[in-house]
Amino acid sequence: MKIDILTLFPDMFTGVFGSSILKKAQEKEAVELRVVNFREYTTSKHNSVDDYPYGGGAGMVLTPQPIFDAVEELTKETDRKPRIVLMCPQGERFTQKKAEELAGEEHVIFVCGHYEGYDERIREHLVTDEISIGDYVLTGGELASMVVTDSVVRLLPGVLGNQTSQVEDSFSTGLLEHPHYTRPADFRGMKVPDVLMSGNHKNIDEWRHKESLRRTYTRRPDLLEERELSKQEEKWLEQIKEDR
């Protein structure tokens, strides 16, 4: 997979892309990550990439020319059109399902904005997707693109050492992940649930499933509205409600 990031601040990505899972994914050649400063593509004699908005108003607006030219340069040798993703607070809310969708692409280009916003022609005639990571405002799209890139890359084949871990992560099953415990079994009087040390894998799996359901119900009940519960899950959910 190939991922390109269009940004005015390429140095922001050095530490993130050179560490942890993203570093390992590149070493395994599961993904090629490129960070491109789209200022290098401007034709402005002042080397600018933004201008005042027509009609007046506060702030500066990113001009279309350098972003269009950068995308055209990055895609000139490919037959298949890539997904071009605009990072912005007006976009579709990013979810695990969206991460899985993007992970199936051969080439994704993230466009990171800054200043007041983008010229609308970038939205209308260039990008294929607009993504937001939450209902809050960031200085630019860089941090958001890092979040999405990390979420997508870890889904690529061979990137994670334990594929089971990936499947059991929060949101992958539509539920939040169950609690985890490790040694010691008794820490300052706080004990690990007996079932986890019983060796009975059927009971352990059942406990984890039920606790995932409990955690989802108490912390993110909205997720249950989108999920078709099994009969067993419905039974557990009734017990969970009675326990509260």
UniProtKB/Swiss-Prot annotation:
Its EC number(s): 2.1.1.228
Annotated compartments: Cytoplasm
GO CC aspect terms: cytosol
Major site of localization recorded for this protein: cytoplasm
Enzyme kind, highest EC tier: transferase
Entry keyword annotation includes tRNA processing: yes
Keywords: Cytoplasm, Methyltransferase, S-adenosyl-L-methionine, Transferase, tRNA processing
Reactions it catalyzes: guanosine(37) in tRNA + S-adenosyl-L-methionine = N(1)-methylguanosine(37) in tRNA + S-adenosyl-L-homocysteine + H(+)
Function field: Specifically methylates guanosine-37 in various tRNAs.
Stored NCBIfam families: PRK00026.1, trmD
Quaternary state and interactors: Homodimer.
Protein name: tRNA (guanine-N(1)-)-methyltransferase
Organism: Bacillus mycoides (strain KBAB4)
